[in-house]
Structure formats: C-alpha cells, structure tokens
Amino acid sequence: MSKAAAFLTDPPLVDDRPSFETILKHGHQDLVQAVAFNGHGDRCATGSVDGKIRVFNRLKEGIWRLCDNWTAHAGEILELQWLPTTVYPNLLASLGIEGRFKLWAEDPSAAPGRRFAESTRNGPLITIPSPRLSSHPSHLTHSQHPQQQPHHHHAPESILPSNPPPTSNPPQATGSTTAGSGAKPAFETRNPRSPYRSFSIKHIDDTRTTYLALLSADGGLTVYENDRVENLAAFSLMDEFNVLDPTAATGPGQASTAPRGQETSFRVRFDPNPDVCYTALRDGVLSDALGLVVAVQDTVKVYRTRDAVRASLGLAAATKEFYLAAEVVAGVHRGLVRDVAWAPGNIRGYDIIATACQDGFVRVFRLDTLSPSTSDTTKFAREPSSIDLTQGGELDDEKRAQESAPESRWSSSRVRRHATRRQGPSQDALTITTSGLRASLDSHNHQQTPSRELDAADRRSRRAWTNQPGQVRHTLTEISRLDNHRTPVWRVAFDDDGQILGSVGDEGKLLCYRQKPDGTWAKSSEMSVVKVKMAAPQ
C-alpha cells in the first residue's frame, strides 16, 4: 500500500534534458539577420549581415551539425526560405540587400563548403528572357543541369543579362566560396530599376505549380509561376503591378515612393493554406484563387486573384490577375509595419493575419468575405470605379449588382455590351466569371482594338476595387492589439497549425500567444536570452 501511495504521490524521474539541442555556436562572425527551417524541422539555414549562409542538419540525437557555409550575397541577407520538402528537398531561397533573389541547389556528393555554392558544374548555361509588361522588366537568369537526379534539382552557373549595372565585389570568405568567384546559384533574378526587398514562395501540390512573389523598393510586386517542378528555368511572369498609392504629386498611374533618407519597410507573404476558406468559396471566391498580403510602410493590403483575359502578341489568353480585396489604411499602425504573417488553418471559417509594428504592438486581424446578397451599401459604400469615371459616371445599382453576382451567366452579347461600355485602361485584361470564360475569349478576339492596349503606367496601377465580375469584397477586422513587448516588434510568425503566434521585439524576447474562446489572442509563454558569466575553470 505504501508503495502504491509513493507511486501516486511521487512521479517517476524523467530526463530533464530537451530532445534537441539549440544552435548556441552558429559560427557567424557578424549579426544573424535571417533564420529559416525546412518543413520537417531538421534543417536550419542562417544568414548574416556579411552575406554568408550557414546550413545545419539535425541528427537523430538532436545535435545540430554544420552542413555547409558559403558567401551568397555581397551584403546582408534579408530573407531566407526553404522550398517545400515534398517537391524541392534541397533548395534554399535567399534575398540580399543588393536586391538579388537566388535559389541554391544542394549537391550531396560535393565537399563541405561547396554543396550549395557549386551544386552545378557540368551543365550548359541557360538564360530565359522575361516578358515586358511594365517599364522595368525583371531580368531572370537561370541555370539547369541536363541530367536531373531524383529529389535534387541541380543547375550550373547562372549568367547575367547583357550590360548589367555595376555591382560591388563581394567580400572574400575564408573556408567558403565567394559570390563572385565560386558561388553559383541555380536561379537568379533582379530588378534593374529598384532592388527587391521581400519575397514569398508557395507550392500547390494538386496542380504541381510553384509561385514566386517579389516586392521591390519602389512598390512593384512581381509574381512568377512555374508548372514544371523538375525545371527551374520554367518560371514565367504571371502578373505585375504596383502596391503603392498614387499621390497628387506623382499623378495617376505613378507610385508615391518614399523620400531619400526615409526609413522604409516592405513585406509580402502568400496565403499558406492549400485551399481557399470555405466561407470565401461560398461568397464567390474561386477555388484556385491565390491570396497575398503586402505590408508597405504603415499600410497592409490583401490581394486575391480572379480569372481574366489578356492580349499577348495579338492573341487573347486566359490568365489570373490580382485585385485589391481589403486594406488596412494608413493611421491604424502608428509606425512602420516590420513584418506580416498569414495564419495556416483556415478551417475555422475565416483567415487570420498578424502584423509586427514599430509602435510596439502586435495586431491580429480577421479576414472575412462579404456575401453579395447580404452586403450593406451604407456600411460599405461603393467606390466609383476609375473606369466608370472616365465614361462620365457610375453604372446604375441594378446593372452593377447583376454584373457583380458570381452566379450570373455571361452570354456573348452581354460581354460585348460590357466591353463597349468599359472602354478603359484594363480592357486587355477583361475580367470575367468562370462560366463565361469561353464567350469572353471569343468576344475579346473579335473586338480587340488598339485603344485597349495598356501602357506601362496603367499596367502598374494599384489594382484598386472596380466592382467587376470576379471580385469579392473582403473585410479586415482588428480582433487583438498586443503590447506585451513594450518595444518595437520586428518579426511575427504562426506555427504550422495556426494555433500559436510568435513575435520577437527589441528586448530580445520571444513571446507566444494563443487564441482564447472568444476569438481574441493573449500571451501564453515567454522565452528570453539571459547572459550569465561563466566561472573560470580551476
């Protein structure tokens, strides 16, 4: 009896050591700016201010061991991201302060120090020209190995376009390859007009399509797609526009850039969920629609895709085009938005977006769709379309409601009337519903006129709400404002299930939050780094 009582009162001894060890000695000689884990959590990549990337592998014993180290960029590394492990198990994406986006492919047979930097040494050089949809085309440089090995996508040295802008030589690294002499990315792209400042990658398993979004310092957002996972040189331009609002000084069609010397902040993130939220599907969002959240300065914008028709070389082709679905206007964030995160797990019936602001607050927003049948015009006043204003006024409410209804069927005659009435800058990308795609293609081929060609300024418009078919109104509601850091917040991120939100501030603490039953978020745990003076060994 005493043994049973002792067993009930005193729990058995357990090992207090964690199942894994932290990377205390990362080996960087400078400040670590970016950290990324792969989908399985057994590989970690760190990027420092001196442009070096170090990759660590976690062994079965929980010990982290250095795998490779090389100089990837000429300056500090802004962001790192592993590509999906199910498709690209050994591909790492990086973005440097010089504005170059690179993909690094691992060669497991190479020696340490050259596994990523010289993963392709025997294949031919391949350069793919980028389409010119704007006044600042993005030059893509690709390299690919002719013999693809299973689970490894190797590529030889990438080449730059003719007459590239001068760049500074990267610093030499001891014990690792350099970006100028030996580091050979499998894929590389840059923007000659404005450097890239943020990127995001998403892969959809059902369609085996990979999407890449790049946000530049002038507000230009470029989205590429690749439906050939075995070929890194298959990226093609999907859409390109500007996310900055035009001002009276710049005029329509031009973005308002920040003055010289002013601090800026840019972030772009894809919707990580493989499927669209079921409530959004019910309200008319397409099942294959993409979602993007963009943070520029103190504003946050959410974009969705719709089906569109675009003229290319005199032919009309079906494509996807982004439109502004919701926006957190300037003034809500009383500082620069340093980071933004889109939560996985939209099975809850709505999406969640979190922001890290310089004013010390972590804000959590709820993203919902507004059903066309229950929309209130007094609550959400219809914004006059720029296309309608060029024709001298808005359409009447009855016709507008008929056109915006997702279940409406578009005939060929109706598409012709719509195209005639909407002679504006977006006619080469006439938006249509899924049911009327074939009719719209026929109508577009018969009614194509030179006046419907877009110039560069119109193509880079901000994609404001125009109430065209295929657009679904979204709403952003702030559900929590967390000030536990009391200092500027730099990073926010959700776990894989979207149940835990983490943030890091200037004080060096990692705070975790959980959602309460009433839908709000509250602090649940805290982790901090404490410096302890170690006693000298005797």
UniProtKB/Swiss-Prot annotation:
Its main location: nucleus. One of its GO terms (biological process) is protein transport. InterPro entries: Sec13/Seh1_fam, WD40/YVTN_repeat-like_dom_sf, WD40_repeat_dom_sf, WD40_rpt. Keywords: Membrane, mRNA transport, Nuclear pore complex, Nucleus, Protein transport, Repeat, Translocation, Transport, WD repeat. GO terms for molecular function: structural molecule activity. It is a peripheral membrane protein. WD repeats lie at residues 27-66, 72-114, 191-234, 260-313, 332-375, 484-523. The keyword Translocase does not apply. GO terms for cellular component: nuclear membrane; nuclear pore outer ring; Seh1-associated complex. The keyword Electron transport does not apply. It is found in: Nucleus, Nuclear pore complex; Nucleus membrane. Residues 110-200, 374-431 are annotated as: Disordered. Functions as a component of the nuclear pore complex (NPC). NPC components, collectively referred to as nucleoporins (NUPs), can play the role of both NPC structural components and of docking or interaction partners for transiently associated nuclear transport factors. Involved in nuclear poly(A)+ RNA export and NPC biogenesis. Component of the nuclear pore complex (NPC). NPC constitutes the exclusive means of nucleocytoplasmic transport. NPCs allow the passive diffusion of ions and small molecules and the active, nuclear transport receptor-mediated bidirectional transport of macromolecules such as proteins, RNAs, ribonucleoparticles (RNPs), and ribosomal subunits across the nuclear envelope. Due to its 8-fold rotational symmetry, all subunits are present with 8 copies or multiples thereof. This is Nucleoporin SEH1. It comes from Chaetomium thermophilum (strain DSM 1495 / CBS 144.50 / IMI 039719) (Thermochaetoides thermophila).
